[in-house]
Amino acid sequence: MVARSRMGGPWSRAQRVARAFQDAGHEVALAWGDDGNCVNPVAPTLEIPVPSPLGLPDAIARHTFPLASRLGLMGRKPVHSFEEVLWLTGALDERYTRAAVELLRTHMCATRPDVVYSEFNLAAVVAARAEGIPCVGSGSQPTTTAYASSPRKSAGIRRLLREMGMPAPASSLTILEGMWRRFIPSCPTLEPQAGERAVYCGFLDEPPALTPRPRDCVLVYFGAGSVPAGVAVRAGRELAEMLSCDVYVAGVSEAVQAVGDREVTCAPRFDFAELLPRARVFVHHGGQNSVMDALTYEVPQIIVPGRVFERRFNAEAVENARCGLSVRASKPALIAHAACALIDEPALTSGIRGVRAELRSLGGGARIVREVEELVG
């Protein structure tokens, strides 16, 4: 999945899957786009076009959407389904999909891959089906039509499919659900109804061994656009004061603020693998990668999902599994009080080790490779 908005999850998952196939001795090509998310590819690449949000002219979209993200304006619009996400990013635009499918088909026709793996890329599934190539890919419970869909957003895709002589389901999500296998980077405890042809694979990479060390900081990361940068920084200050520890706020401009004898360090990005083993709490937006990162290092989670369907699903799943708490309103004081509650009440995080063990047992990227090898022979 390529998109103009800042979303590192799809690319990082695609990279991990690619490495798993490489480790098993397979040749891999990565389709990528100039969207600011696709960097440092681990395999040879094929450049594909990047959709323009809402089908707007590219020159406008390049400037307006990053600005809206920084101001937190994106978080004010409810997003009810993954179909709406595809529409907002421009991935359902008929002209874009036609161009992407043609380019991908040309590449597939020339190279004849044994299988296509789609990281929520609709054009890849359509192109593979048109070329008669097996297609598998990533999936999740909240991206199924049974969970939520918005068929009115997919009229252009239906026209294109009819023109290509293919079935044109009401919802574009049905196309993604029709892949030969759907690999769920989660577990039944968190996503009990993942849909047809679902294979749970848990952590894509083997999690590191955990060694005892002081938990002496809090990490805050709200992703792209769901919470204004100023609110994230104020939440960091509240957390530093109430928990009496240093706080790191990712996804904002560089700064260091003193709160008593503690510091709130802000930066566009940090190495989470260095900070999470030290973290008492991880406060985040509910993205899939953030949820898995917290569980990897057995860190209690505070999720502030905003008005996005998938993040709300993840927040509820984490809370029900006793791995953290959700806070619906992005108010710094509420976030800090929830963090205190997590630390003071062990029962609220009593499920973390069990869920981590379940995720670890499901096979990860190696499981994906084995399933695909059996599928295509």
Report residues per predicted region:
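Conserved nucleotide-sugar donor-interacting segment of glycosyltransferase catalytic cores
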Residues: D93-R158
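A short, glycine/small-residue-rich beta-strand->loop->alpha-helix junction that serves as a flexible
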Residues: A3-Q15, V39, G225-G230
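A donor-sugar binding/catalytic signature common to diverse glycosyltransferases
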Residues: V116-E119, R269-A315
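Donor-nucleotide binding loops and adjacent catalytic segments primarily
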Residues: A18, A198-V281
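Conserved nucleotide-sugar donor-binding subdomain of glycosyltransferases
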Residues: T64-V115, G156-S171
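Conserved nucleotide-sugar phosphate-binding/catalytic loop shared by glycosyltransferases and other
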Residues: D23-A24, V28-L88
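A nucleotide-sugar donor-handling region in carbohydrate enzymes
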Residues: Y147-V227, A250-E254
